[in-house]
């Protein structure tokens, strides 16, 4: 849902405005109703009493919007969905209006309005809650200074020019509001507009469109008309208005009755004639407040509306569905099955702090869109961009840092820090190469592209604010508009339809467009290389404009490219040309020597059929030289060296001074430069770290080039970037894979699934590294892959070292040449060290949609997808974290000790076919006292095997932010598998939290824990996990639910400066399960205590552990949370009843010993924030203890087995805690890393 509050000022009294408003409505309804497909029916218009606002007038209308919806979207909807109902309660000066659709049940528009005699200064006239105020966007509409769309401008409706004959008012100057505030009269319409369209892939785009065009644009024009029509209504009374309303209702009823007689509905749009109509929501929101503004003129709909949704031919329902299924029922089934998943969540899907929302709060504020409507409206009045001369103002889209200016770390950001601190707050710049859908037919609309980028920016801000606060304000997005290269191909293919000659034929609406052919035809055009050169130039312009801007001053972060379906193809070739020009991101001669024969495999001087449009259809036969099939393979391998007409048009190669890779000798050299193509100087002026493709058919294009030029090796077309990510939906007819082109055997390996954001906002623990995939699917590539894997301190399931080290590190055992050459060849051919193909979730119901509608739907879905945004942020933030230089200690990449033979021969036999279940206890030590680490090394889920007499290496991350592990020593396990390691006194650690990893020397499995060093008197809060957090009982089965608001309460105590201690009566063999549960729900980091093995008295062990904290560590426990069983434990610690909080029903005999939180954590949190505990603790400061999310992660294998890992952090937490200080790197739990880091890779 998108919420905006509009303030509309007019220089008139409230009584005058009431008459003006009602007169305007009936007049516009009369003028703009043309019948079927466009018009208004008034079903009821009667007074009411004791309703919204007291007594007023109730109106019930039906708007017919069929002719205002694009053909591709209309193909999804039945006729019933082409009507919008309006119910309005007008109790002036308060009105309330609601718009619904009889068919689209998850669509609604609600508008509340107060008309007050002021200048719009009241901050909260609707009495919104704190959460609603944070979601609300304020927007003031100025009837004089705000520009209207060029197609709607009329001089007689311009307040700057209008002067009333009867009243003498006008014209209005730009400072009219200030003058009216001093002299009067002046009134303001406060309008709170809530728009919701909760359907997959379309929500953000349609909600934004309705607000910024359907609501704001209509309200602006309607109020300009109300002012300029005052000579018509100034002498009317309310009785005259009611009479006009009744006359209008009768006239509209007669007009609609005539049109409904014998009408079959709006005519289907024909292929090849793109629609210029509006998207749904234009007339749906036609009257932004019932008695406010009816639909715009139907006779001449503004073309800019249609450009918001790229339109194509309408596809009727195919006969494959069978005659027994009606189009009406089929459409209903389609729309119901793509409703947002959040609406279909079962009770098993538990969200933190869900119960804390009021009826007016939104459960999903990540869908809220922050959007500058003034910029959008101004764009309508700006002239169309001249091809090749992009407007820098349009290209520069506002970054996330402008959307949410959260408080940041003061170090280096205020300009007063050390000189070595980076001055620019932006660490990652995203350049979006936006060309549009492959079915776009026009030259491309910059406003639509800008809206898509703004939607993506909003998604970035929402996801970052909740789960990546350390990136808030450090990411910027910029638009790079790309030429719509598929437009000519689409026009050509549309006219090749078997039914193109018969515009009235019903079969013409069938889906006869071969979607896969469009990018192939587009990239074969002689103008394609010119388009690539244009993209390179515009990208450099956008980058330079960012550097010149205030937010880009001093920028030295990473640059990431994002390309949509067509923009991805152009961006790939731009990167390939940059690599061939010697500016590859890795700077190697191998990368820099590639030429660009792949850019356009067509015959050079042949006339371009796509450029000529449909004129080629009149030819009897094409020229022989225009047929690429007539060129033999020998011609392609040995082109005419003198650059004759039969030579291939290719991009220029690098200069002769650069070495050429031997494997490229078979590729034809460039013999001539393509007209208007990239030149030697055309290259990107910056290094690209990553390139994300959104549903791009790049794989098909590369396959065509490989077919046309057999000598071309696709793997050698190395783009000048460090990594490519090919994101697509499995049901997308335009998408294709890339990995099988680089290594054919990858056709048998499924693409990696991008985790769902609702379940895994921080990733599901799956490794993205190519090396891990090669090891997992070793049977496809070689028989002895494990022989060449370098020795690493990792789990048995796979390595977490850098994937590109697999050919460079010495093997633990000698490998056969055939073994290593196959894997090294794959690693050498790969574009990066991670997987390339990634599959996104989409509803299964999309497979039943008409194929011609899918490109538009999928193209829109990427910009609002939280799955996509979270995936991108995980990759970019991982790269932004500190990296070591080559001169630093190499233990971060290479363990101090490789795998060795087991000390005991029986060990190999004992641990066969069992998985490790090692664990180490979290240790809390008072500063200055001995620091001792303890661990236990077992195998099997129930500790069936003990690791006895084996070496274990102890690593400690002494500087958690650096990710650098230091080897502290080696110990040998005893007969019970236990290990005790005293930290040497000369290496004793200071106050702080230090991750510890104990790695078994024999198989490199490991246990993890944290060593926490505190000062005397540190204050702490204790939470019993099973007693205070879980809302359901689960011993060994599915994950228990989290009590609503539990995470918020713990985070409040942590933010107040207290040490968090978690205790549980579960045995330590369940540590991985419990820790993974805490991590997935994003509980704040703390010390975790388990029972030592199975015990009949877990409460006694809890009490002993807490007593040791009080007596030995000298902690001061100020509060305890748990169940009624924990009351005695906390009482033994000396906690008073006011410090003991018990969750659940009150027990009468314990009421005097504790405080029962019968109303739940949400109410308790409000008391904490308003009470005495909201201040910082009185003990000594502990700035070194990081305020972060839970950091110790469970092994990968365990996380993968979880069937339902629920949403980790409710959005309400951010609303309650505010922007706050971003947590440190320790906030991201990690299961496996290329550098033994604990920060999340995926």
UniProtKB/Swiss-Prot annotation:
CDD domains: SRPBCC_PITPNM1-2_like (cd08889). Residues 684-878 form the DDHD domain. The keyword rRNA-binding does not apply. The keyword Phosphoprotein applies. One of its GO terms (biological process) is phospholipid transport. It is found in: Cytoplasm; Golgi apparatus, Golgi stack membrane; Endoplasmic reticulum membrane; Lipid droplet. Catalyzes the transfer of phosphatidylinositol (PI) between membranes. Binds PI, phosphatidylcholine (PC) and phosphatidic acid (PA) with the binding affinity order of PI > PA > PC. Regulates RHOA activity, and plays a role in cytoskeleton remodeling. Necessary for normal completion of cytokinesis. Plays a role in maintaining normal diacylglycerol levels in the Golgi apparatus. Necessary for maintaining the normal structure of the endoplasmic reticulum and the Golgi apparatus. Required for protein export from the endoplasmic reticulum and the Golgi. Binds calcium ions. Interacts with PIK4CA and VAPB. Interacts with PTK2B via its C-terminus. Interacts with RHOA. Has higher affinity for the inactive, GDP-bound form of RHOA. The CDK1-phosphorylated form interacts with PLK1. Belongs to the PtdIns transfer protein family. PI transfer class IIA subfamily. Keywords: Calcium, Cytoplasm, Endoplasmic reticulum, Golgi apparatus, Lipid droplet, Membrane, Metal-binding, Methylation, Phosphoprotein, Protein transport, Transport. Disulfide bonds: none annotated. The modification Phosphoserine is found at residues 300, 304, 319, 326, 329, 342, 345-346, 373, 382, 593, 600, 621, 894, 1235. Pfam families: DDHD, IP_trans, LNS2_PITM1-3, PITM1-3. This is Membrane-associated phosphatidylinositol transfer protein 1. Phosphorylated on multiple sites by CDK1 at the onset of mitosis. Phosphorylation facilitates dissociation from the Golgi complex and is required for interaction with PLK1. It comes from the Eukaryota. The modification Phosphothreonine is found at residues 59, 282, 287. The modification Omega-N-methylarginine is found at residue 1209. Residues 272-282, 643-656 have a biased composition (Polar residues). It is a peripheral membrane protein. InterPro entries: DDHD_dom, HAD-like_sf, HAD_sf, LNS2/PITP, PI_transfer, PI_transfer_N, START-like_dom_sf. It catalyses: a 1,2-diacyl-sn-glycero-3-phospho-(1D-myo-inositol)(in) = a 1,2-diacyl-sn-glycero-3-phospho-(1D-myo-inositol)(out). Its main location: cytoplasm. Residues 259-330, 581-678, 1207-1242 are annotated as: Disordered. GO terms for molecular function: calcium ion binding; phosphatidic acid binding; phosphatidylcholine binding; phosphatidylcholine transporter activity; phosphatidylinositol binding; phosphatidylinositol transfer activity; receptor tyrosine kinase binding. It comes from Rattus norvegicus.
């Amino acid at each position: 849902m998108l919420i905006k509050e509009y303030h509309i000022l007019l220089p008139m009294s409230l009584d005058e405005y009431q008459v003006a408003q009602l007169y305007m409505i009936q007049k516009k309804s009369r003028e703009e109703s043309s019948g079927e497909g466009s018009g208004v029916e008034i079903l009821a218009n009667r007074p009411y009493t004791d309703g919204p606002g007291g007594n007023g007038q109730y109106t019930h209308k039906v708007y017919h919007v069929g002719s205002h919806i694009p053909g591709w979207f209309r193909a999804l909807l039945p006729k019933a969905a082409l009507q919008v109902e309006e119910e309005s309660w007008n109790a002036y000066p308060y009105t309330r209006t609601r718009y619904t659709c009889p068919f689209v049940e998850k669509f609604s528009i609600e508008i509340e309005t107060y008309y007050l005699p002021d200048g719009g200064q009241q901050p909260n006239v609707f009495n919104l809650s704190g959460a609603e105020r944070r979601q609300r966007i304020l927007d003031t509409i100025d009837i004089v200074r705000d520009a209207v769309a060029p197609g709607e401008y009329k001089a007689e409706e311009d307040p700057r020019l209008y002067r009333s004959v009867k009243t003498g008012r006008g014209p209005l100057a730009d400072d009219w509001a200030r003058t009216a505030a001093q002299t009067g009269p002046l009134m303001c319409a406060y309008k709170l507009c809530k728009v919701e369209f909760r359907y997959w892939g379309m929500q953000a785009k349609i909600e934004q469109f309705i607000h910024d065009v359907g609501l704001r644009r209509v309200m602006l024009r309607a109020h300009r008309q109300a002012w300029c029509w005052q000579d018509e209504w100034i002498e009317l009374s309310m009785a005259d208005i009611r009479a006009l309303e009744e006359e209008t209702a009768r006239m509209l009823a007669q007009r609609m009755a005539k049109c409904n007689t014998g009408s079959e509905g709006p005519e289907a749009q024909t292929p090849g004639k793109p629609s210029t109509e509006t998207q749904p929501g234009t007339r749906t929101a036609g009257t932004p407040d019932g008695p406010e503004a009816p639909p715009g003129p139907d006779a001449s709909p503004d073309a800019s509306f249609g450009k918001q949704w790229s339109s194509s031919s309408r596809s009727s329902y195919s006969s494959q569905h069978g005659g027994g299924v009606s189009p009406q029922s089929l459409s209903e089934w389609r729309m119901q099955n793509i409703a947002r998943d959040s609406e279909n969540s079962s009770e098993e899907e538990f969200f933190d702090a869900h119960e804390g929302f009021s009826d007016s709060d939104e459960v999903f504020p990540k869908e809220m869109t922050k959007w500058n409507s003034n910029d959008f409206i101004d764009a309508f009045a700006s002239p169309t961009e001249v091809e090749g001369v992009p407007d820098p103002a349009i290209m520069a889209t506002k970054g996330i840092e402008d959307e949410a200016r959260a408080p940041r770390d003061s170090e280096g950001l205020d300009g007063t820090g050390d000189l070595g601190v980076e001055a620019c707050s932006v660490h990652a710049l995203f350049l979006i190469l936006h060309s549009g859908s492959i079915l776009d037919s026009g030259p491309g609309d910059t406003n639509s592209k800008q809206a898509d980028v703004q939607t993506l920016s909003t998604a970035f801000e929402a996801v970052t604010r909740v789960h990546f606060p350390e990136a808030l304000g450090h990411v910027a997005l910029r638009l790079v508009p790309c030429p719509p290269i598929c437009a000519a191909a689409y026009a050509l293919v549309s006219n090749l339809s078997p039914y193109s000659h018969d515009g009235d034929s019903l079969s013409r609406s069938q889906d006869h467009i071969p979607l896969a052919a469009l990018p192939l035809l587009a990239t074969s055009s002689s103008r394609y290389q010119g388009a690539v050169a244009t993209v390179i130039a515009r990208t450099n312009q956008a980058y330079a404009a960012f550097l010149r801007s205030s937010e880009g001053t001093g920028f030295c972060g990473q640059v990431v490219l994002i390309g949509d379906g067509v923009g991805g193809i152009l961006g790939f070739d731009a990167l390939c040309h940059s690599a061939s020009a010697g500016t590859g991101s890795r700077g190697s001669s191998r990368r820099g020597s590639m030429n660009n024969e792949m850019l356009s495999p067509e015959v050079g001087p042949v006339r371009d059929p796509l450029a000529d449009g449909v004129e080629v259809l009149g030819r009897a036969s094409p020229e022989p030289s225009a047929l690429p099939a007539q060129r033999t393979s020998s011609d392609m391998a040995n082109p005419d060296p003198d650059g004759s007409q039969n030579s291939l048009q290719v991009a220029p190669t690098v200069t002769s001074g650069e070495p050429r890779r031997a494997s490229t000798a078979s590729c034809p050299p460039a013999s001539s430069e393509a007209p208007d193509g990239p030149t030697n100087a055309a290259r990107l002026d910056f290094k690209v770290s990553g390139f994300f493709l959104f549903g791009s058919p790049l794989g098909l294009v590369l396959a065509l080039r490989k077919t046309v030029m057999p000598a071309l090796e696709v793997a050698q077309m190395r783009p000048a970037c460090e990594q490519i990510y090919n994101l697509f939906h499995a049901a997308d007819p335009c998408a294709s894979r890339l990995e099988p082109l680089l290594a054919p055997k990858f056709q048998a390996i499924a693409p990696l699934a991008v985790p769902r954001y609702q379940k895994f906002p921080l990733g599901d623990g799956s490794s993205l590294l190519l090396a891990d995939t090669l090891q997992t699917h070793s049977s496809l590539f070689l028989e002895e892959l494990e022989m060449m894997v370098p020795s690493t301190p990792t789990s048995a399931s796979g390595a977490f070292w850098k994937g590109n080290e697999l050919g460079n590190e010495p093997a633990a055992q000698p490998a056969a040449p055939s073994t290593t050459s196959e894997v090294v060849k794959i690693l050498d051919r790969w574009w990066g060290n991670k997987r390339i193909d990634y599959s996104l979730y989409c509803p299964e119901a999309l497979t039943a949609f008409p194929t011609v509608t899918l490109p538009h739907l999928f193209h829109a879905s990427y910009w609002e997808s939280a799955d996509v945004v979270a995936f991108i942020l995980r990759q970019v933030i991982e790269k932004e974290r500190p990296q070591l230089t080559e001169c630093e200690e190499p233990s971060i990449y290479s363990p101090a000790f490789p795998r060795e033979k087991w000390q005991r021969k029986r060990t190999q036999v004992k641990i066969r076919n069992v998985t490790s279940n090692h664990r180490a206890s979290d240790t809390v030590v008072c500063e200055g006292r001995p620091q001792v680490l303890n661990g236990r090394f077992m195998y099997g889920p129930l500790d069936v095997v003990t690791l006895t007499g084996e070496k274990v290496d102890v690593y400690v991350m002494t500087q958690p932010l650096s990710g650098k592990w230091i080897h502290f020593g080696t110990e040998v396990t005893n007969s019970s598998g236990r290990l005790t390691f005293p930290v040497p006194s000369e290496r004793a650690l200071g106050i702080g939290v230090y991750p510890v990893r104990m790695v078994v020397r024999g198989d490199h499995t490991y246990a993890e824990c944290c060593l926490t060093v505190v000062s005397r008197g540190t204050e702490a809060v204790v939470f019993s996990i099973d007693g205070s957090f879980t809302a359901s009982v689960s011993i060994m089965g599915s994950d228990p639910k989290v009590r609503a608001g539990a995470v918020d309460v713990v985070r409040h105590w942590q933010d107040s400066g207290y040490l968090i201690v978690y205790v549980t009566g579960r045995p330590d063999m369940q540590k991985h399960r419990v820790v993974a549960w805490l991590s997935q729900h994003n509980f704040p980091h703390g010390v975790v205590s388990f029972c030592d093995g199975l015990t009949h008295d877990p409460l006694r062990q809890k009490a002993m552990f807490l007593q040791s904290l009080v007596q030995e560590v000298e902690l001061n426990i100020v509060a305890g949370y748990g169940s009624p069983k924990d009351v005695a434990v906390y009482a033994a610690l000396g906690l008073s009843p006011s410090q003991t909080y018990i969750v659940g029903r009150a027990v009468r005999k314990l009421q005097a010993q504790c405080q029962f939180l019968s109303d739940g954590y949400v109410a308790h949190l409000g008391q904490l924030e308003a009470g005495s505990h909201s201040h910082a603790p009185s003990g000594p400061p502990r700035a070194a203890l990081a305020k972060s999310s839970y950091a110790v992660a469970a092994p990968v294998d365990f996380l993968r087995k979880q069937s339902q890992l629920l949403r980790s952090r409710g959005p309400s937490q951010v609303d309650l805690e505010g922007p706050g200080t971003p947590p440190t790197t320790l906030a991201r739990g990690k299961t496996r890393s290329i550098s033994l880091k604990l920060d999340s890779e995926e």
